[in-house]
Amino acid sequence: DSISVEGNVRFPLDMFTSMTSKEKQKRVEFCLDHVNIEQKAFKLFPSEISGGMQKRVAIARAIALNPKYLFCDEPNSGLDPETATVIDQLIQSLTKEFQMTTIINTHDMNSVIEIGESVLFISKGEKEWVGTKAEILNSGNSKLNDFIFVNKLYAQMKKGS
């Protein structure tokens, strides 16, 4: 809570690059712009911004070093469905724009359906199922089905398929 939005994104640049201060500032602005954070929020602290904005700051920090891989651990936890969808779309667009491989750990089936391509289902530390989101509804894996179809909407979708 002691580092501003701007400082949060600058942190990996300070730690792992020899960029000039001007170059760092330009990169910070670039990253924050890409996650739709306006300059007036740069000096704010985490306690002064919404949960959705905090997630976007974390994503901006994650892309600051222009990684090949983006790892997201429960990127939608604590967010309302509308904001979660915004975060999913943001991750999806950044993945394409920066040509990164993105790995998302989530319990949110909406996210899996929204942005998943290859899906790995793990239960109690064991790989249970691997496939595409298109194959999920027709999976014969009982543990996967129990997890997914606890939601009545998905259960109705399965009956219809």
Where are these regions (language model features)?
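Short helical segment in ABC ATPase nucleotide-binding domains corresponding to the A-loop/adjacent helical element
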Residues: 6-14, 25
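Conserved ABC ATPase "signature" region
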Residues: 22-40
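Conserved ABC ATPase signature
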Residues: 45-49, 53
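Conserved catalytic motifs of ABC-family nucleotide-binding domains
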Residues: 66
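Catalytic Walker B motif of ABC-type/P-loop ATPase nucleotide-binding domains
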Residues: 70-73
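Helix N-cap at the start of a conserved alpha-helix in ABC-type nucleotide-binding domains
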Residues: 81-83
